[in-house]
């Protein structure tokens, strides 16, 4: 199944599950979930994965599609269902949240995609800063290229006590506890078209040099 775009029914379901987060409502609308949210998200994920695999065949990428069911052990007062769905294209391994990962997520009032790693170990970020200190020119070249595009922005929590970066260009990158390069948007016409897949694929290709840089740090830290 090729990705043809999301539909208004996609958003209707997502808003519905946000405000009716209970089993009876979900079961009554399960066909809507499968047809208008799960199927197009799977198709989008497969198209993005196949394009990245073709462009970078040596990368050990795999596709992971989330479940709409929350972990019953971690509801914390929330309903049993998520009001969003995501997929990621990442390297294998269990501890993937500490490695760079390409992702897409859709909710009732937004969609987002990009690349980041959200739970890196302190030792990894220390190794990252050491690598920047020793060879700042490597990341500077990547950051200069990143700053020429407008599709993604740098985000992520920062250290309360600022760390001294080797150059002003790297200050924002050097002080992050974790790094996310993201594109956020409210529902728009792009989301309802086939062009969304190409936007994501081209964006991920743009981010690939940064992915390679951070993944190399992760690989070195695991040795």
Please name every model-derived segment:
Residues 2-16, 23, 45, 152-223:
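Long, solvent-exposed, polar/charged low-complexity segments
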Residues 30-37, 117, 128-132, 192-196:
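Short histidine-centered catalytic/ligand-binding loop motif
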Residues 48-59, 146-147, 213-223:
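Surface-exposed helix-capping loop/turn segments at secondary-structure junctions
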Residues 54-81, 85, 150-163:
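A short, surface-exposed loop/turn module that caps and links secondary-structure elements
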Residues 63, 82, 110, 176-178:
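Sequence-level motif detector for i,i+2 pairs with an aromatic at +2
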Residues 73-133:
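Aromatic- and glycine-enriched beta-alpha-beta binding-site module
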Residues 107-168:
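Compact, glycine/acidic-enriched structural inserts
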């Amino acid at each position: 199944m090729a990705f043809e775009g999301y539909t208004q029914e996609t958003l209707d379901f997502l808003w519905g599950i946000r405000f009716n987060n209970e089993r009876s409502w979900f079961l009554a609308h399960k066909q809507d979930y499968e047809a208008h949210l799960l199927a197009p998200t799977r198709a989008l994920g497969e198209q993005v994965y196949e394009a990245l695999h073709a462009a970078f065949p040596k990368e050990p990428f795999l596709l992971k599609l989330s479940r709409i069911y929350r972990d019953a052990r971690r509801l914390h007062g929330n309903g049993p269902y998520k009001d969003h769905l995501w997929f990621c294209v990442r390297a294998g391994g269990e501890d993937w949240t500490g490695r760079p990962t390409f992702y897409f997520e859709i909710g009732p009032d937004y969609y987002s995609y990009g690349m980041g790693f959200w739970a890196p170990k302190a030792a990894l970020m220390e190794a990252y800063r050491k690598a920047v200190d020793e060879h700042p020119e490597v990341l500077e070249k990547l950051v200069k290229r990143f700053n020429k595009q407008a599709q993604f922005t740098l985000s992520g929590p920062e250290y309360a006590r600022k760390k001294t970066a080797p150059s002003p260009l790297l200050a924002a990158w050097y002080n992050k506890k974790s790094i996310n390069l993201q594109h956020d948007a409210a529902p728009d016409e792009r989301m309802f078209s086939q062009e969304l897949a190409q936007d994501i694929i081209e964006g991920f290709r743009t981010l690939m040099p940064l992915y390679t840089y951070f993944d190399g740090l992760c690989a070195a830290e695991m040795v």
